[in-house]
Curated annotation (Swiss-Prot):
GO terms for cellular component: cytoplasm; DNA-directed RNA polymerase complex. It comes from the Bacteria. The keyword GTP-binding does not apply. The N-terminal domain is essential for RNAP assembly and basal transcription, whereas the C-terminal domain is involved in interaction with transcriptional regulators and with upstream promoter elements. Residues 1-230 are annotated as: Alpha N-terminal domain (alpha-NTD). It is an enzyme of class 2 (transferase). Residues 246-332 are annotated as: Alpha C-terminal domain (alpha-CTD). One of its GO terms (biological process) is DNA-templated transcription. This is DNA-directed RNA polymerase subunit alpha.
Length: 332
């Protein structure tokens, strides 16, 4: 049964699982019902639209007038060459925002991404195919590679490049896929809390974790506009929420301590159901429990110390009264 509260439960757990070099899972929980999708959906959108990447924005090919032209000695027409070119994923090495790169190939040759690697740029999908030229052909082209976010259509790029260049649709985002699942998770015997499982796949320009961090930063920056008028004390709000949940372990059942049957039965008979009840006790009170022997006493003391609540130390600080009240509510 869910209790009435005055603030939403703050998630306390996060896991990052690197599935492979370009795939990662970010798992966070527990969230109040409805909060998980409220956060996951915009984060997914921001992963696609705000993550910085690189893309070819224009190409100039010797002997070619426009994108519907053909080139003697090349298997592909110019349209197919451009499609293959846009499938290559570039990464500038020198933190530059824009580079013009010159290429020259003599046939016979099958050209793939690895052939475009040089001191300026790296192709992160080096096996991707570009073109084939025969023994009589020579392929020379200039390529503009830029740094950006999201998608920019060729019509907009055409406005600022030289007329001899062919403008390209620029797909900057390095995020190939971002999907999330919302799962239920149990908190304080309530199964209605939620877990976000976000899977991020990138093309290799950046790692999935870098992309995720960038989306979080973008969300913070976009939300900060409201603070210009409302003057929200974000640090105070976070501190308040963290204080309310920092001892959440104490609201778990003593069953989670994995005590021996003798020790657990002794606590059960004393109606001690929550870990927090042990944390609130003095060692002398624990010793006075009926039928609690020295072996069980030592076991409970060791387990409580292991989870950060040793007897004889004031680990709860000013949280004691709030914890007593919460446990009383749970047991009522």
């Amino acid at each position: 049964m869910k209790k009435i509260t005055t603030s939403a439960y703050m998630p306390t757990e996060i896991e990052v699982v690197n599935v492979s070099e370009n795939v990662a899972k970010i798992i966070a929980y527990p969230f109040e019902t409805g909060y998980a999708v409220t956060l996951a959906h915009p984060l997914r959108r921001l992963l696609y639209t705000s993550t910085v990447g690189f893309a070819p924005t224009a190409v100039k090919i010797d002997g070619v007038a426009h994108e519907f032209d053909s080139m003697r000695g090349m298997l592909e027409d110019v349209t197919l060459f451009i499609i293959n070119l846009k499938n290559l994923r570039f990464k500038l090495k020198n933190d530059s925002k824009r580079e013009v790169i010159e290429y020259s190939f003599k046939g016979p040759k099958e050209i793939t991404g690895i052939d475009l690697n040089n001191d300026i740029v790296e192709i992160v999908n080096p096996d991707s195919y570009l073109a084939t030229i025969n023994e009589d052909a020579e392929l020379k082209f200039s390529l503009i590679v830029e740094k950006g976010i999201g998608y920019v259509p060729s019509e907009e790029i055409r406005d600022y490049i030289d007329s001899e260049y062919i403008a390209l649709d620029a797909f900057f985002t390095p995020v190939k896929k971002a999907v999330y699942e919302i799962e239920n998770v149990l908190v304080e015997d309530n199964p209605d809390y939620e877990k976000i499982v976000l899977t991020v796949t990138t093309d290799g320009q950046v790692s999935p974790i870098e992309a995720f961090k960038h989306s979080i930063e973008a969300m913070y920056k976009q939300m900060s506009i409201f603070n210009n008028v409302l003057n929200i004390d974000v640090n105070m709000a976070l501190t308040s929420s963290q204080n309310s949940n920092e001892h959440s372990k104490l609201l778990e059942s003593v069953e989670n301590l994995n005590l021996s049957a003798r020790s657990f039965n002794c606590l059960d008979k004393a109606d001690i159901r929550y870990i927090g009840e042990l944390a609130l006790m003095e060692e002398s009170e624990l010793k006075d429990l009926k039928n609690l022997g020295k072996k069980s006493l030592d076991e409970i003391k060791a387990v409580m110390a292991e989870i950060g609540y040793p007897f004889g130390e004031n680990t709860l600080g000013d949280s004691k009264e709030a914890l007593r009240k919460k446990i009383s509510e749970l047991k009522s």
